[in-house]
Amino acid sequence: MVYILIAILIFGVLIAVHELGHFLAAKACGVRVNEFSIGMGPQLFHKTKGDTEYSLRLLPIGGYCAMEGEDEDSDDDRALGRQVWWKKFIIFVAGAFMNFLTGLIIVICLYAGAQAFYTTEIVELNPDFPQQGEDGLMPGDTIYAINGERIYLKSDVSLIMGLGDTGTIDMTVLRDGKKLDRTLTRQVYTDENGKEYEAYGFTYGGIVEATPLLRLQYSWYQTMDYVRIVRLSLQMLLSGAAGVNDLSGPVGIV
């Protein structure tokens, strides 16, 4: 029960932050906001300042930003429907941008105490790896992209390699500041017990000491990773690689 309440509260905060983005953008664009509410249901507190009524409501399940002319025609020059297209666009995307910014701030806070980060540096090659050397891979190379997807974090490598893995990957590495394109194919190797297994034959994941700048950099990388996961999920859904049964709404997530 406690976890359900926490989940509901988190969803409420996400929605309230989203609506705050619409509110701030509307105010900045000169659109009249009739009411900005945090929460839903009966009012616990309200105060009118200027043309806007600010409300705090009983149920912590979101909020709303009621703009003039949002749902019906209005003669007010400050109505949403009477604004130029670019102002409408800014107001429309401001909610999602505020959620993105909030996520970035949360990740920055989580990484504030990090002491070190894993990199995408190749640290070791299997002795039988067939593409060693200048024309292949070398320890110290940094994985930059796989199959056209930019690699930011160590976890990205396994994520991207696992998407529709056909046994061959196109990899871009950084070596001495230069980008080098390589095509790798899974090979059959033998472990110390004589058992055969398939692998690409490289080990990655160096360690770098965290600095204030690196904490910000990796916070940005992690946030962009979350955005990419959403994009890839939508692509898989549209392409048929994932079905609607793999999706969950708020109730399923809770």
Description of each model-found segment:
Residues 2-75:
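Small-residue-rich helix-interface/hinge motifs
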Residues 3-7, 84-92:
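Residue-level signature of transmembrane alpha-helical entry/exit and packing/kink sites
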Residues 71-86, 98-254:
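PDZ peptide-recognition modules
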